Amino acid sequence: MKKNQFANKLIVIDLLSVQRESFYSFLTEGLAKELNNFSPIIDYTGKLELHLVTNQLVIKKPKFSFEEAKRRDCSYTISINIVTQLFNKNSGDVKEQEILLGEIPLMTQKGTFVINGAERVIVNQIVRSPGIYFNSEMDKNNLKTFNFLIIPNRGAWLKCEIDKNDLIWIRIDKNKKINLSIFFKALGIDHDDLRIKNAFRQPEFIYKNLNKDENYTQQEALEELHKKLFPGEPATSEASTKILYFKFFNPKKYDLGIVGRKKINKKLDLNSPENIRILTIQDILSGINYLINLKFGFGNIDDIDHLANRRLKSVGELLQSQISIGLIRLERLIKERMTICEQSSLVPSALINPKPIFAAIKEFFNSSQLSQFMDQVNPLAELTHKRRVSSLGPGGLSKERAGFAVRDIHPSHYGRICPIETPEGPNAGLIGSLAIYARINPDGFIEAPFYKVNQGQVLKNKGIIYLDAEQEDEFKIAPGDIRINETNFIKEINVPVRYRQEFTQCPAEEIDFIAVSPIQVISAATSLIPFLEHNDANRALMGSNMQRQAVPLIFPERPLVGTGLEAQIAKDSGIMAISRSNGIVKFTSAEKIIVTDSSNNQITYNLQKYQKSNQETCINHRPIVWPGERIKKGQILADGSATDTGELALGRDVLVAYMPWEGYNYEDAFLISDRLVYEDLYTSIHIEKYEIEARQTKLGPEEITRNIPNVGENSLKQLDENGIVVVSSFVESGSILVGKVTPKGESDQPPESKLLQAIFGEKNKDVKDTSLRLPNGTRGRVVDVRIFSREKGDELAVGINYIVRIYVAQKRKIQIGDKMAGRHGNKGIISKILPRQDMPYLPNGTPVDIILNPLGVPSRMNVGQIFECILGISAFNLKKRFRILPFDEMYESDSSRILINQKLKEAQTLTNLDYLFNENHLGKVALFDGRSGEKFDNPVLVGKIYMMKLVHLVDDKIHSRSTGPYSLVTQQPLGGKAQQGGQRLGEMEVWAFEAFGAAYALQELLTIKSDDIQGRNEALTAIVRGKTIPKPGTPESLKVLMREIQSLGLDIAAYRLPNLHHGEIKSIEIDLTHNKIVQKR
């Protein structure tokens, strides 16, 4: 691929702008807008007014830096102060004060929030846009009925429907149906009103509906409406009069939003000003007119899944609605205080309490479905999490009720939401990812970039034009992978296009727009898969998701075969240290880099060393500049975890062979060489946090000390004089990390202490050892120790004197049971590690690193891995790296195959390795068995593939139990590693025992080895005394089942039937509701 062509297909954008721009607009506009809606507050008597001066909003800097907030386990927040004025209309006094309104978490440069020391992300929510929606449904008689629904931003929903008898009904908030005639009367519209005549295309259809209830007055109609909406409440004339005003015409209770107003104006062809955000009578009349026209075959029904009807709520808007909730609570509080307190002595600070706003913000960040603990396994996982789009959450869908239509890929998703990247399982289709070049417009609709096309010529010099889904429907749009000549004219005569959600063909002269790049359809993670177009979509989905689970390695390596987006994604993830100005590097070390800029100012870049991520992987910076080097603004100073010279590096390129090997790679298992273990190719660092608190007890304070009773000097050698482990110590299971003693009372004394005291009158030490020890199965090096105490000014909970945190880093080499995967969804578990001398080897003696099963390719249809494999070995031998954008068939037919064959031939010519290129079986090599030295019968595909080690490590999964906790109800062992649980002998295992006829083994497993309490105690006694094990009794779970049946009023017990030689067994059916007995024979 030519370099200039490649560059033309990539446009540079900021992948985190979605989060940053939304939060910035909230701080600069949204917050003030919300406060303006709230001000002024007038008390119930109308004598006091509280005004918020929003143009004097003061935002104060955070108390701690972002790093310090994480270290102290507190939130990284800004304080919002506002100038308030209290007007007393009786005395004419005006009191002015600056007041703290609340604290709001501040977004970091990486688009995250620090809440209680943990980084969190606010996910973008995709919801139905406010506006008017027309729909058709089939009723129970299979007749087509029409309806419309007006959805506001805030307030009641209004639904209008035409039934099979051509009668029009109104529903407010899914309540009972209301006759149109009563609704019009309540609105003050008479039957002979001119507005009816002017608003309707078919006025006779309306008059047929209105002549039903002519004798109602407006007051009676309002009272009738009140009865329907609030059944059981008295319909007083005062309450009835206000009902419609509060539902649809009060700006404080009802808000269409600017978007809702625009959508209604466009759909109904109205020109109401955008600042009228309540419903108008004109909106209702025009809506009913459109509905009647639909009945007569005019107009269009709306597609609810079209992205023109769904908008994105990003962090700024979600926060704004949360502030609104807090302000509503605050308003109620202020009005109460205005009534209770003495008016003459009132000041604004006595009225405003920041707690309601604090609480609303805290509730949102700590417990909302959209505020999530950041996925921090690697830089790609972070970036993808911030670009995620969710249909779930408040005001959205729930995964239980969401049907297939909502989850499906819609034509309007093209270039906006990735059709590939979505979770597997119950959330499939409900959670997506923004396409790589998509952006959000101010109204919250997703836009995609295009070039204008004029008479078959692509006008690249005119720049990029962004269109939303609604605008796009009106144009003929060509995909990004059609061929264009040097003068930017489209080569093809007939071009595939999208037009009004259909895929069709048209001449090049009729095309209006063309996509800017073939990859604009897919998300950031999917765009990292080379030869994507040769993979089945299901496997591409797995490949996208598994890249996010790749563990950062000690020695990261950028891929030989990539797509060219690795550098952009690594840079935008915020994981690397990037220069903020031009200058010269003055000093570099593992801890910091000092740069002198053009104004001779020194800028210090502090580097992160062995920091723990949210998923316990290691965040670490490695400097890649040297003293004296001249640097430019935006240049990378230090690589982060999983990056290599500024490019994303999630795995390693290894030599693989596709062949079966003694059944060890059956069913997706992998065989690996011990070279991967000994050379630390797949070694990663994982950091775990261990914490201990020293509390104030009734018997005195707990002490952190080196003087621990009954502990030898050997166990204390790694502790300092305060009893805390020294940084850089190597610790193993059972090692003391923090020495702690707790005072104990007389009753806690063991019998031997009481005996000594009785004989010698000595008092044994009255403390017990409660030290923090390293748990079983863990070892590593202490990388950090943090001590929190009140003396240092740390905020600790009541009753806690000290907190000590120890961070232990473990090096985890690759081992049997670990999960590995490529970028094409080719995943597997390591089943065996072979010595490198036993691995199959190439004719030049090079042993392969991994043996994959060839049967994993045909049925999965992820052929991209074969292309990568062959191009990878060519790249390795040519000492080059290849960057191949997906959908490269635009250059010529079969271009991927031509390219890999061409590069393989070049590699053979350059290296003189004849086995590399064999025309009879391209890409395949005659391999030799490492054990016997004999050649294998058939040639084998050998190449270089980029393989990753995933976060599903066997060390975290493997678990055993001897004795442990039991469930209180069933008396069976608990399940799961966290509960120290056992392995369940389930239904299928029972079948296996039954199939073998192992009746006694099965009986034991289901009774005395499980939940027959009495039986297991008797069995233990019998074993101890050498007697015969008695027969098992009744399992506890059967007793539980019997109790449950008995609780339903059914007496269940075992009865012995009498020996009936000639009689019959009678079956009696009892109808419990009628007390009748029906006898059956």
Swiss-Prot record:
Top-tier EC class: transferase
Gene3D superfamilies the record matches: 2.40.50.100, 2.40.50.150, 3.90.1100.10, DNA-directed RNA polymerase, beta subunit, external 1 domain, DNA-directed RNA polymerase, subunit 2, domain 6, RNA polymerase alpha subunit dimerisation domain, RNA polymerase Rpb2, domain 2
Protein's UniProt keywords contain Plastid: yes
Binding partners and assembly: In plastids the minimal PEP RNA polymerase catalytic core is composed of four subunits: alpha, beta, beta', and beta''. When a (nuclear-encoded) sigma factor is associated with the core the holoenzyme is formed, which can initiate transcription.
Classification of source organism: Eukaryota, Rhodophyta, Bangiophyceae, Cyanidiales, Cyanidiaceae
GO MF assignments: DNA binding; DNA-directed RNA polymerase activity; ribonucleoside binding
Keyword annotations of the record: Chloroplast, DNA-directed RNA polymerase, Nucleotidyltransferase, Plastid, Transcription, Transferase
Role noted for this protein: DNA-dependent RNA polymerase catalyzes the transcription of DNA into RNA using the four ribonucleoside triphosphates as substrates.
Cellular component aspect of the GO annotation: chloroplast; DNA-directed RNA polymerase complex; mitochondrion
Cellular compartment(s): Plastid, Chloroplast
InterPro entries per the UniProt record, alphabetical: DNA-dir_RNA_pol_bsu_ext_1_sf, DNA-dir_RNA_pol_bsu_external_1, DNA-dir_RNA_pol_su2, DNA-dir_RNAP_su2_dom, DNA-dir_RNAP_su2_hyb_sf, RNA_pol_bsu_bac, RNA_pol_bsu_CS, RNA_pol_bsu_protrusion
EC number: 2.7.7.6
Catalytic reactions of this protein: RNA(n) + a ribonucleoside 5'-triphosphate = RNA(n+1) + diphosphate
Biological processes, Gene Ontology terms: DNA-templated transcription
Keyword Transmembrane applies: no
NCBIfam families (UniProt xref): PRK00405.1, rpoB
Protein name (database record): DNA-directed RNA polymerase subunit beta
Originating gene: rpoB
Pfam families per the UniProt record, alphabetical: RNA_pol_Rpb2_1, RNA_pol_Rpb2_2, RNA_pol_Rpb2_3, RNA_pol_Rpb2_45, RNA_pol_Rpb2_6, RNA_pol_Rpb2_7
